[in-house]
A protein has these predicted regions:
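Alpha-helical bundle regulatory/interaction domains
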Residues: 1-150
Length: 150
């Protein structure tokens, strides 16, 4: 792709990286999430990352402003915000108004992104279905449950 054509589509290389994450990793799971197929969505995310592991392990090394970690967290946040907004339809949480869709989307985006980054950092040696099991465990157990199990 020549430079002029590139800049007709993307602002910079970081914009391109966000596009790749959205298109290759998150778009394929959108339909699964909308149909409450959460485990299948997790396995697909980790499988697609692993399929292009060399690319994502290099991208992981991008640090500082516009780091890969920041880009992926924002992409996950955008997807979750959309999904939460569809279900909540603008209504505040009945018991905790502070829990806005934005707050919940950011919390879960950071959580998911942490697991993704640790998995990439560790060389993606754990199988996608096992990483999905780990994430499901973390999400279904409170901090207090986990402390009691130690």
């Amino acid at each position: 792709m020549i430079r002029v054509t590139f800049y007709n589509h993307f602002q910079d290389k970081y914009d391109l990286l966000g596009y790749i994450v959205r298109r290759e990793i998150l778009e394929p799971v959108r339909i699964l999430l909308r149909n409450s197929m959460y485990r299948e969505a997790l396995i697909l995310i980790f499988s697609n990352l692993r399929k292009d592991s060399a690319f994502y392990q290099r991208a992981y090394k991008i640090e500082g402003q516009n780091s890969f970690e920041e880009i992926t967290e924002n992409c996950i946040y955008e997807l979750l915000l959309e999904l939460f907004s569809e279900r909540r339809s603008g209504k505040p949480h009945s018991k905790f108004p502070w829990l806005t869709v934005e707050t919940m989307a950011r919390y879960y985006a950071r959580s998911m992104n942490y697991v993704v980054m640790e998995w990439i950092r560790s060389g993606m040696t754990v199988a996608p279905d096992e990483v999905a099991d780990i994430y499901e465990y973390i999400m279904s157990h409170s901090l207090w449950d986990t402390l009691d199990e130690l």
